[in-house]
Amino acid sequence: MKKFARFIGIDDGYFVRNVHKKTKLIGAITKHTILDGVLSREITIDGDDVSEKIIDMIKNSNHYYQIRGIILYGITFAGFNIADVELIYKNLGLPIIIVMERPPKDIFYKAIEKYKPNGIELIKKAGPIYKTKTPFGYTYYQVYGIDKDTASNIINNLAIVSKIPEPARVAHMIARGVTKGDSSKPRAGGDSNPGPAG
């Protein structure tokens, strides 16, 4: 893919479980390092609507035909609202890269099995977890509709100031800023997930 192709990074906002029913889903479109657009929707805490919201958000955007790929900051959003990469790819035709700062621990899978009966099946659709070395450390990732080597090159091309590719990093900052009031606040409490979450 071209160095200056547009990608959309997607992450969720802050929430407190049992207090909030919904949180923001933010899509940040970048042309390499330049922010080119911002999209948003609301998703349900521990719900099942993140995939349809991602599809709706992108498909109804003027940026749709310019976007060359989707970078999800984790596969779980708003708690246990798990992205169905197969469904997203089928509807949008865009390759998907799921990035994580670290591989998930066993507690993540146990929680999914307990609270989301079809969750493991959705996660398995994204395939194995790979890792690629960036100037800022290893980025762990899954892919759908794209090969792992091409995805690795994209991650490294977009890892400008951290090991998280710029579209996903910017989406995370915007989501945190608009829902918590401060994009610099670390994950804590109800908005953190026990695994590769956004």
Curated annotation (Swiss-Prot):
Top-level division of the source organism's lineage: Archaea
Disordered: annotated segments: 179-198
Similarity comment: Belongs to the UPF0215 family.
Matches recorded under PANTHER family: UPF0215 PROTEIN MJ1150 (PTHR39518:SF2)
HAMAP family xrefs: UPF0215
Name of the featured protein: UPF0215 protein NEQ431
The species this protein was found in: Nanoarchaeum equitans (strain Kin4-M)
